[in-house]
Regions:
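General secondary-structure edge motif
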Residues: 25, 29, 42, 61-62, ...
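A short, basic N-terminal segment
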Residues: 1-58, 156-157
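P-loop NTPase nucleotide-binding core
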Residues: 68, 72, 76-249
Length: 252
């Protein structure tokens, strides 16, 4: 529920809410303006959020009849946790998108989740590139503040490289972390060198869009791709990386 002194809904948000409700779907933004009677459920789920923010994990089933408000509650929590600095990923399961499969169904779920990555500043999905760029910018800013060096100074570049390496080294200790860290490093160097084409190749790999190892090898020099067998491990790698990048956690 909104505070008494903050009732006015911005026009862009109000239009999004109305269009979604007309179409019979839950709005992805602006839900606090129309949420009522969910205090107990929200508090229970936000307790889980606090656990995640402290480095723990949580898993919930929300069960109810058709039309009872399950999707509405999930989207409400989605908005709450983004305001708390979390990254959120969501996907609807279907015969083509499953938690497990041998014909691309698991990978399809992963692709949907990564494609729908959302943050407070990009709540409607597609936030992966934004998150990666923000991470690099924050590392550069931190290095400037701590060293007092001016941008362009070779010593500053070295200091940034060391901080980037610290993150990639920590990630590399996890399952498939070595490959993940290598691709993360490729993105960083492409960002610094202004190589937009290489950045997009890296993003394609993170999204699980390379169909063969040969294709990934030719594009990035890595001999591994994300598949049905290991996509969940990469989801865990992203969760660990997001924490290191300064976010409160990841909620799927």
């Amino acid at each position: 529920m909104m505070n008494e002194d903050n009732k006015k809904v911005p026009k862009r948000i109000s239009q999004t809410i109305l269009n979604s409700l007309k179409g019979g779907v839950v709005p992805r933004i602006g839900l606090p303006y129309i949420t009522v009677g969910r205090k107990n459920e929200i508090e229970a789920l936000l307790h889980d959020v606090d656990i995640i923010a402290e480095g723990g994990a949580s898993f919930r089933f929300i069960v109810g009849r058709y039309g009872s408000g399950k999707s509405f509650l999930i989207q409400t929590i989605r908005n709450y946790v983004m305001d708390k600095g979390f990254i959120v990923a969501d996907a609807d399961l279907s015969p083509e998108r499953r938690l497990q499969g041998t014909r691309g169904q698991g990978l399809a779920t992963y692709r949907e989740l990564i494609g729908n990555l959302s943050t407070k500043t990009k709540p409607e999905g597609g936030a992966l590139t934004l998150v990666l760029d923000r991470w690099i910018n924050s590392v550069q800013t931190q290095a400037v503040q701590e060293t007092g060096l001016e941008p362009g100074n070779p010593m500053l570049t070295k200091a940034v490289d060391q901080r980037i390496y610290a993150v990639t080294s920590a990630v590399s200790e996890l399952v498939h972390g070595l490959e993940f860290a290598r691709v993360l490093s490729l993105y960083y160097h492409a960002y610094v060198d202004g190589e937009d084409e290489m950045k997009m190749k890296v993003v394609r790999w993170f999204r699980g869009e390379y169909g063969t190892k040969r294709e990934a090898k030719e594009a990035l020099g890595v001999n591994i791709i994300i598949t049905d067998d290991d996509w969940y491990e990469y989801l865990k790698l992203f969760a660990a990386f997001f924490r290191m990048a300064g976010y409160a956690g990841m909620m799927v």
